[in-house]
A protein has these predicted regions:
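Intrinsically disordered, low-complexity N-terminal regions enriched in serine/proline/glycine
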Residues: 4, 17, 61-63
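Composition-driven detection of intrinsically disordered, low-complexity segments
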Residues: 8-9, 66
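Bacterial N-terminal signal peptides
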Residues: 9-17
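Sec/Tat signal peptide C-region and signal peptidase I cleavage site
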Residues: 17-23
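A contiguous strand-loop segment
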Residues: 23-108, 132, 136-140
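The feature marks the mature, well-folded catalytic cores of soluble enzymes
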Residues: 26-29, 41, 112-124, 128-131
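Accessory structured domains or lobes within enzymes
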Residues: 33-35, 121-161
Length: 161
């Protein structure tokens, strides 16, 4: 009986670790809630692509540093970063926001974040970009965003909203 209990407990723990290992972890901290008085974002990027790189870009209104897959030689998909205006963005995949949606377009979050880093200086700029971005978006994500004005927010985004 003790062996069976130990085996079941071990399997339960290992199952929990497996699930946890594939969960993306993020945090958005507003300036008023941080010891330094500055907003912060944090992301543990869980991805099947284990080789990542930071790249400097000068292809937009603002220069920016972006996290890319190392094999993305053109830097088309940026998976988080910060620009020269003090705007920063990252995402956490949200697999349940497009349930029942038959749209085939998906995995466009990196393209969207690249555009946001190129063009946005504030949360208001990002909200305008979200309003005007073509739909369906090909996105299933929570975007964590901060700006130089002390703004900090999460945005839940799917193909249509």
């Amino acid at each position: 009986m003790k062996k069976k209990h130990l085996l079941l407990t071990t399997l339960f723990i290992l199952t929990g670790l497996y699930t946890t290992a594939h969960a993306c972890t993020t945090a958005v901290i507003a300036a008023k809630n941080s010891a330094s008085g500055k907003s912060m974002i944090w992301k543990l990027r869980d991805t099947d692509n284990l080789e990542n790189a930071m790249r400097h870009f000068e292809d937009g209104k603002y220069t920016y540093l972006g996290l890319v897959n190392a094999n993305d030689s053109l830097g088309e998909h940026v998976w988080g970063g910060a620009n020269s205006a003090g705007f920063a963005i990252m995402n956490s995949a949200s697999y349940n926001v497009n349930v029942g949606d038959t749209t085939q377009l998906k995995d466009q979050e990196g393209i969207f974040m690249k555009l946001a880093l190129q063009t946005c200086a504030s949360l208001d700029d990002l909200e305008k970009l979200l309003e005007t971005y073509p739909k369906p978006r090909g996105q299933a994500s929570h975007f964590g965003v901060i700006d130089a004005n002390g703004g900090a927010a999460y945005y839940e985004v799917n193909n249509w909203t």
